[in-house]
Amino acid sequence: MDNFLALTLSGTTPRVTQGKGAGFRWRWLGHGLLELTPDAPVDRALILSAGIHGNETAPVEMLDKLLSALYSGSLTLTWRVLVVLGNPQALAAGIRYCHSDMNRMFGGRWQSFAESDETRRARELELSLDTFFSSGQVRVRWHLDLHTAIRGSHHLRFGVLPQRDRPWEADFLAWLGAAGLEALVFHQAPGGTFTHFSSEHFGALSCTLELGKALPFGQNDLTQFSVTSQALSALLSGIETSTSSSPPLRYRVVSQITRHSDKFALYMDAQTLNFTAFAKGTLLAEEGDKRVTVTHDVEYVLFPNPSVACGLRAGLMLERLP
């Protein structure tokens, strides 16, 4: 199965759907779904996902290179792995999504969206994770969902972690730093993301990794993400990565800006970078007689997008943690 990406983009079903690799077995589970199981017993399970948004291609290319290294035998596998290319149709079309944003649908939220390929795919992915994590004796569960951002950022690589009732494990956060993430953002409320679903329902240590800016296939400079790729290779092989000399800055979400109607106005232009700082009292958005202002001494914006559909998030406001 050394042509997983090509098969996914073409929508083709392989003639052979399972086989042997270098020290592992593989099974094609469906379009964009590939399970890898080491020959030796392991108690660690890892979801590696990318392409939830079809225009975010750099992580997909990164996973393709990791798979090639595994199949060639130059990389040893020490985890059970489920590789997920989230939205095959949008990936093939080179667009963010075909009908609706899938990363708002998980945890059963797809039921509140108009039925589409994305709602069906979200349900399929939920079932796939359930099956994967239910198989075998699993002591450690991780989920790394690889993305790129729509706009530029003051932090080239950063992670977004879902709301979690338990403390985050230190080795997981340390690995994220070793993977080159310059900042970590901690959600304080539940959401419809893929990583929140895996964390809430399966207790996985989950993170959305944002790696640079969204570009078409073939236009990505993967050398920007070599530290992340090297950390993923080490993780798969069971090799401990060295701790980053500069731990990631930490932020938490303090509010969400939501667009409710066509009267919504977000006072940030297309050049506003992720993690841009705003002083207390700054007017961020208006909608009718409702005004959204900065309430802390300094807040930082993440994912500003005035063009989202009504009812969806138009941005997150963050505060720095000590």
Swiss-Prot record:
Gene Ontology molecular function, alphabetical: hydrolase activity, acting on ester bonds; succinylglutamate desuccinylase activity; zinc ion binding
Reaction it catalyzes: N-succinyl-L-glutamate + H2O = L-glutamate + succinate
Signal peptide positions on this chain: none
Record: active site: 210
Entry binding sites for Zn(2+): 53, 56, 147
Keywords: Arginine metabolism, Hydrolase, Metal-binding, Zinc
Protein name: Succinylglutamate desuccinylase
